[in-house]
Structures are given as structure tokens and as C-alpha cells.
């Protein structure tokens, strides 16, 4: 049996190339003015920077919150499904809430959006 071994490094290099291309395209789609406004909101936040989502968007929000916390920004993740069952109480008036959603029409987020507006300083 003379089976040819796959070249894992070549496969990894192709994956890296695709990821670099995707990030390059993403950076072209981001509105620079809005991005800077969000950064200013986070930097000037007197409370917590709260990141909320559900599903895959929630996973990204949780990771982003963790990264913010590790850089000294007061931040925590709020699962949208849990929020409607009591966790909204963790939101305070000086907090900034950043909602992660692929569609912008997630039922769990829509259901609690009005309550969130009453509790925090700003929603992104």
C-alpha cells in the first residue's frame, strides 16, 4: 500500500488565504464613522459594556465581551433568551448595550428590546 499522505500544511495555507481575503473584504464594508462612534461609546461608558446575542451571534458576542474584559473594559455577556427570564435586571442606566444579530429579527431580542431601551444609556 503506497498511499499518498495529505499535505496538511498546504490545506492550512489555503484556509489562511481564504480567511485573509474575507477579513480584507470585511474591512471594506465597515462604516468607519459608525465604527469610531461605537469605539467612543465603549471608551466613554461609565457603566458596563454589555454584549447580547443568541446562537452563533451570541457566541461571537460572548467572545468579544471576554476580549473587552481582558483589556480592562468593564464588560459582560447577556444571553437574549436568559434576559427575558430575569437577567435584564443586570442592566443599569449607565451601561451601553451592543446587540449581535445576523438577521436583526431574532424573536428573543425583539421581545426584550423595548425593556432594554428603558434600562440602558445607549443601544448599538
Name what the model sees in each region.
Residues 1, 7-44:
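An N-terminal, well-structured beta->alpha segment
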Amino acid at each position: 500500500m503506497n498511499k499518498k499522505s495529505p499535505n496538511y500544511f498546504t490545506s492550512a495555507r489555503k484556509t489562511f488565504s481564504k480567511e485573509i481575503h474575507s477579513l480584507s473584504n470585511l474591512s471594506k464594508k465597515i462604516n468607519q464613522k459608525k465604527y469610531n462612534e461605537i469605539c467612543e461609546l465603549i471608551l466613554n461608558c461609565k457603566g458596563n459594556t454589555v454584549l447580547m446575542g443568541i446562537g452563533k451571534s451570541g457566541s461571537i458576542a460572548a467572545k468579544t465581551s471576554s476580549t473587552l474584559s481582558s483589556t480592562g473594559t468593564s464588560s459582560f455577556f447577556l444571553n437574549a433568551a436568559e434576559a427575558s427570564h430575569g437577567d435584564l435586571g443586570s442592566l443599569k442606566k449607565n451601561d451601553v448595550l451592543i446587540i449581535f444579530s445576523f438577521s436583526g429579527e431574532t424573536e428573543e431580542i425583539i421581545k426584550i428590546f423595548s425593556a432594554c431601551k428603558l434600562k440602558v444609556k445607549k443601544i448599538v
